[in-house]
Structures are given as C-alpha cells and as structure tokens.
Amino acid sequence: MDSTTHGPRTHVPGRLFIGLMSGTSMDGADGVLVRLDGPRPEVLASASLPMPAALRDELFALNHAGANELERAALAANGLARLYARAVRQLLDQAGLQPGDVAAIGAHGQTVRHRPDLGYTLQLNAPALLAELAGIDVVADFRSRDVAAGGQGAPLVPPFHAALFAGGQARAVLNLGGIANVTLLEPGRPPRGFDTGPANVLLDAWCQRHTGQPYDADGRFAAQGQVLAGLLEHLIASEPWFALAPPKSTGRDLFNLDWLLARLQAFDGPAPQPQDVQATLQRLTARTVANAIDASAAAPRDVLVCGGGARNPGLMRELAYCLQRPVHPTDDAGVPAQWVEALAFAWLAQACLDRIPAGLPTVTGARAARVLGALYPA
C-alpha cells in the first residue's frame, strides 16, 4: 500500500475496524476486519501471518538488555509495521474493501518490557509507518495511559470479554496466550481480571529447546511425559509473584526460559526428562489458573477459553482437571478463540475514537477509567 490510498472515506454501512495483535509467544500477527455497530462483532475477514524468523529472533533478543538497543528496537518496530501492513492488505482483499472503508486500525504492537511497578510499559510498534503504509488511521499505545493512572496496564481485554460473554450466571473467560489472564464475570458486579501466570511462553520455549519445533502441537510432546508433583510444587513455591493479590500483571520479563532453567537447576530431585518437564509446565498453567480463580472467591459456572492455548487439547484437559468445572473454547459461544484478542483491539480502537474510557480500575488498579490509546491519522 502507498500514499495513493489516502483520501476521503467511502460509505460502507456500519463502522468497520481492524484489530491487529502479536502476542507474547511472538509466533505471528493475527488480524480481523470487523463491523462493530451491532449487538455482536461481525467478522468480515481474518488473517494470521507468521512472524519472519529474523524479526522474531530480534524481538526475542530485545526482551533482554543488549548492545545498540535503541536502533535495533526502532528497526524491529518498522519490521513489525510492515508485517501488520501485509495483514491489513490481506484483510481488505478478502473483504473486497478499500482503506477508506475502515474507520481505524487498533494495533497492539509487541511487548518487550512491562514494568508497571516502575511506571512504564513498552510495546514496540511503528503506528505512524503503519498509517502511512495502510492509508488508515491507527490507534496504538493502549497500555501506557492506564499505567500513567497508576494501573497495571494489563490485562486490557476484560471489558471486551464482558461485552461479549456476560450473562445471567457467573463465568470466567480465560485467555491463553504467552501469559494466561482471566476475566471474572459475576452478575451485579463489575468485571474483575488479572494475569495468572505463564501459559505458552514456557511451553513454547521448552518445546523449541528440546524438539526444535516452535510450539507443542496438540500437546503431543507433553503427552509423552508425566507430571512431576515435586517439580510442580517447586515451580510454584519458588516464585513470589504467584502469591501476589490482584491487581497484577506479568510478562516475558519474568517468565522466560532463563526463569525455568534457574528453577530446574535449583530443584532438589533427580534430573527430569524433557517430556516430563513439558507435562509439568502444562499442569503449572492449569494449576495457577485454578489457584487464582479459587483465591478470588469467584464461583464461575463455566470457563470459556480463547487464545492459542485453546487449540491445545492437552492443556484444555489439564484445565478441566484442575478447575473441576466445564471448560470450553469461546467458539462454543460463537466467537472463534483464535481471534478474540485481535477483536478486542479493534473494539479498543473504536472506544478510543469515541473517547470512551476502556480501562477498568477493578482490573488494573488504576485510579479511574481512562481513554486508552493514541491516534495516528493516515
């Protein structure tokens, strides 16, 4: 796309938005083109583009201190914007639409630092470049406004979960990306939500290290092993973050391969087999989700699961075992699990344009709800 796409918007019934998300797993960029003026989002097109290996490696590296970080971060952000622009082109082509038909893009960017305790969160993104390439207004930098108001800046999806899935009974909505986060929906109460701990971030890293595959497809590697109860308890007991009360959030800054290797080295027991570690990590995700829900005093009747982890049948079985209640992908409620986060950022972009506060103090701990995001006009 080039500057010839810029210009006045044509009329398309309803307001159309694009949501773009690349999560903690850094496996690719998910995008949706959606109509948001009805009672439920209407997905007109969807796309998932794999992350180029060189960009993925650089983004991984930028999660840790290193040489020449500023220039490398700027170049990686530009690379991500170009990947996003390819996703936008694919979405428009699928739907037979032009850039002027879309009100705005909500682009999350790639989190490389998340330190709300120090007053900042950093998502690599180049929204100005994306606006130029796509010819569509871009809303980005959703998290920092909440952090400025004293909040965690995460999770941001609970108000969207509430809009989609709230009903007459208590339920939980669990997002299994790199990090797991849960939204608690209880009649008569504002939504609550918080991160519960690692999900795919450790599963993917360990699988990559021992099989060469970027993720554990269908949980097959974990299925070759067995849960090591002693190791599981060691992983939980050795990490103070698990015992923190909400509001709380986390990321790859804390939970990463180095975190896991340090705890394996400190484990007072026989050296575990790689497949047993994978099975134990799968249980770790499920157990910490269950522990967090139990500690919240919520009593959800069921749990709806979205994100990449919803496609892992082994992990879904572990969740059902640990939660002792029905566990279903959000597909069963009419919303494809793979696209929920991208849909959420389309929804957040609309809220920003309409100047509707979308942060929830009951989730992030901010002083008050704020309008989230910054606008980069095309």
UniProtKB/Swiss-Prot annotation:
Residues engaged in binding ATP: G23, T24, S25, M26, D27, G28, A29, D30
Keywords: ATP-binding, Carbohydrate metabolism, Kinase, Nucleotide-binding, Transferase
Domain of life, per lineage: Bacteria
Catalytic activity entry: 1,6-anhydro-N-acetyl-beta-muramate + ATP + H2O = N-acetyl-D-muramate 6-phosphate + ADP + H(+)
Transmembrane recorded as keyword: no
Entry-linked InterPro entries: Anhydro_N_Ac-Mur_kinase, ATPase_NBD
Annotated Gene3D superfamilies: 3.30.420.40
Keyword ATP-binding applies: yes
Residues of the signal peptide: none
A Pfam family hit: AnmK
Gene Ontology BP terms: 1,6-anhydro-N-acetyl-beta-muramic acid catabolic process; amino sugar metabolic process; peptidoglycan turnover
UniProt-listed SUPFAM superfamilies: Actin-like ATPase domain (SSF53067)
Pathway(s): Amino-sugar metabolism; 1,6-anhydro-N-acetylmuramate degradation; Cell wall biogenesis; peptidoglycan recycling
EC number(s) recorded for this UniProt protein: 2.7.1.170
GO molecular-function terms, A-Z: ATP binding; kinase activity; phosphotransferase activity, alcohol group as acceptor
Stated role: Catalyzes the specific phosphorylation of 1,6-anhydro-N-acetylmuramic acid (anhMurNAc) with the simultaneous cleavage of the 1,6-anhydro ring, generating MurNAc-6-P. Is required for the utilization of anhMurNAc either imported from the medium or derived from its own cell wall murein, and thus plays a role in cell wall recycling.
Annotated family: Belongs to the anhydro-N-acetylmuramic acid kinase family.
Name assigned to this protein: Anhydro-N-acetylmuramic acid kinase
Classification lineage: Bacteria, Pseudomonadati, Pseudomonadota, Betaproteobacteria, Burkholderiales
